[in-house]
Amino acid sequence: MSEFKRIPPEQAQALREQGAVVVDIRDPQTYALNHISGSQHLDNHSISDFIRAADLDAPLVVVCYHGNSSQSAAAYLVSQGFSDVYSLDGGFELWRSTYPAETAQGNPE
């Protein structure tokens, strides 16, 4: 894949169940209040370490607030060598309304 794909929450959930990595690019405070269970917070400070440690061929779902910023982040990750990247349409807001039980609270790890 040379480009990322935009996907709805249902497809993102299916990818999660298959072991996809989910990264959340919202601000740290918002992430701490509520995020997709098992997701990792990703920002300008952590992205280099994330890329260095990541499996570039593993499915990667990028989440933001409403599905806009995640597209730019997904395109960047593709440019860094990731081969299977997805942007969550509707972002965390649509995710939360679709899968309210699949959310968690707490600070980024």
Swiss-Prot record:
Please list the residue ranges annotated as the Rhodanese domain.
Answer: 16-104
Taxonomic lineage of the native organism? Bacteria, Pseudomonadati, Pseudomonadota, Gammaproteobacteria, Pseudomonadales
Question: Has UniProt tagged this entry with the keyword Ribosomal protein?
Answer: no
User: Which Pfam families would you find in this protein's record?
Assistant: Rhodanese
HAMAP family, A to Z: Thiosulf_sulfurtr (MF_01009)
- Enzyme Commission identifier(s): 2.8.1.1
Name of the top EC class for this enzyme: transferase
The UniProt family comment states: Belongs to the GlpE family.
Q: What is this protein called?
A: Thiosulfate sulfurtransferase GlpE
Broad class of where this protein is predominantly found: cytoplasm
The free-text function statement in the UniProt record for this protein reads: Transferase that catalyzes the transfer of sulfur from thiosulfate to thiophilic acceptors such as cyanide or dithiols. May function in a CysM-independent thiosulfate assimilation pathway by catalyzing the conversion of thiosulfate to sulfite, which can then be used for L-cysteine biosynthesis.
The record's active-site residues are 64
Task: List the keywords (alphabetical).
Answer: Cytoplasm, Transferase
Keyword Cytoplasm found: yes
Molecular function in Gene Ontology: thiosulfate-cyanide sulfurtransferase activity
- Please give the InterPro entries that the UniProt record associates with this protein: GlpE_sulfurtransferase (IPR050229), Rhodanese-like_dom (IPR001763), Rhodanese-like_dom_sf (IPR036873), Thiosulf_sulfurTrfase (IPR023695)
Location of this chain's protein in the cell = Cytoplasm
